[in-house]
Amino acid sequence: MNVLEIGAGGREHALAYKLNQSNLVKQVFAIPGNEAMTPIAEVHTEISESDHQAILDFAKRQNVDWVVIGPEQPLIDGLADILRANGFKVFGPNKQAAQIEGSKLFAKKIMEKYNIPTADYKEVERKKDALTYIENCELPVVVKKDGLAAGKGVIIADTIEAARSAIEIMYGDEEEGTVVFETFLEGEEFSLMTFVNGDLAVPFDCIAQDHKRAFDHDEGPNTGGMGAYCPVPHISDDVLKLTNETIAQPIAKAMLNEGYQFFGVLYIGAILTKNGPKVIEFNARFGDPEAQVLLSRMESDLMQHIIDLDEGKRTEFKWKNESIVGVMLASKGYPDAYEKGHKVSGFDLNENYFVSGLKKQGDTFVTSGGRVILAIGKGDNVQDAQRDAYEKVSQIQSDHLFYRHDIANKALQLK
């Protein structure tokens, strides 16, 4: 079959790589893709992921059987709806169901109504009310901007001054807009991907752990993710089972009950507190960089899993008996202002590297984004995989990238 993958980042590179491995897939197309994907997919960088009509025309022209949507923006903009209305099979939720990521308030209200464990929250609609609220709220407080923010719309404020600064960042020059304040939760964070079709929820039996902060020791601002690893040895199967029972199954049923038909992968960003797992966030797609490490470890056929889900079957995932560690290299300055156009070399176009922000300039690759390339390490355990990942990092040549040196350290300290 012909499969069209939407998106241009490292997550989409990993999806294209995994789909290309499937015996069920004859050809992978990528829109817009990136030039590092050319060994595994027919890449069409001339088409934008926001040009829904051009994507539809392409899918018709190429007799596409399935469309797999990677990033959140096309989902929230309704690309899946347009494709389905024209008879195409799509892995990814419709516009209404994608609100679970598109609006933090939407997600909080559903969790509140159906008693799904999450932090207590307070919504405000005006800047002056936000500034009033923080004068007496418990610190630290989590400040979240409603809507999409590429993983960077969350600030944890330890002081009133930091909370005021967060509000200024969230509102800018505006006086109105929805901001959600949450009680700060302490515990171990983890990411659980769950395949969902209506009230059928099939969670991965392998979780990943992301590293959101820009710098070592979890310092600096939040980013889209500076690395990840799987499995997570210090989070037990019992915790995964409990997360499935108290979060994954209930949220699938709740969404359907509210009239939202979710079909795709639901990312559950959770935290293991002393009172059990609680939801930090939901995403309507694979995490990035969690997808890169999870799909690298997945032994079974991703396309078969998608078809099984479409047919309402409780698909069974199979995993390689190894650990995977992914280390992200980013442009210096990220997640704030950064330069583009700097040469990067030393990497191969294979399963050891997934590209997020590079483009071809002649025969060389140059930086084109904040997060640039993820190096993948594999090993019999986390320690060996971590060593392998940093060996892969050391092969990359560039004076304009930085990376964290402590990805997966937590697993080694807590094992």
From Swiss-Prot:
E.C. numbers: 6.3.4.13
Cofactor: record remark: Binds 1 Mg(2+) or Mn(2+) ion per subunit.
GO molecular function, one term: ATP binding
Residue stretches in coiled coil: none
Database matches in PROSITE patterns: ATP_GRASP (PS50975), GARS (PS00184)
UniProt keyword Cell wall biogenesis/degradation, yes or no: no
Any one Gene Ontology BP term: 'de novo' IMP biosynthetic process
Binding site for Mg(2+): 281, 283
Named cofactor requirement(s): Mg(2+); Mn(2+)
Keywords: ATP-binding, Ligase, Magnesium, Manganese, Metal-binding, Nucleotide-binding, Purine biosynthesis
Residues that coordinate or bind ATP: 134-191
Keyword Manganese (UniProt): yes
Pathway note: Purine metabolism; IMP biosynthesis via de novo pathway; N(1)-(5-phospho-D-ribosyl)glycinamide from 5-phospho-alpha-D-ribose 1-diphosphate: step 2/2
Catalytic activity of the protein: 5-phospho-beta-D-ribosylamine + glycine + ATP = N(1)-(5-phospho-beta-D-ribosyl)glycinamide + ADP + phosphate + H(+)
Pfam families: GARS_A (PF01071), GARS_C (PF02843), GARS_N (PF02844)
Sequence ranges assigned to domain ATP-grasp in this UniProt record: 108-311
InterPro entries in the record: ATP-grasp, ATP_grasp_subdomain_1, PreATP-grasp_dom_sf, PRibGlycinamid_synth_ATP-grasp, PRibGlycinamide_synth, PRibGlycinamide_synth_C-dom, PRibGlycinamide_synth_C_sf, PRibGlycinamide_synth_CS
HAMAP family: GARS
Family: Belongs to the GARS family.
NCBIfam families for the chain: purD (TIGR00877)
Protein name stated in the entry: Phosphoribosylamine--glycine ligase
Natural source organism: Staphylococcus aureus (strain MW2)
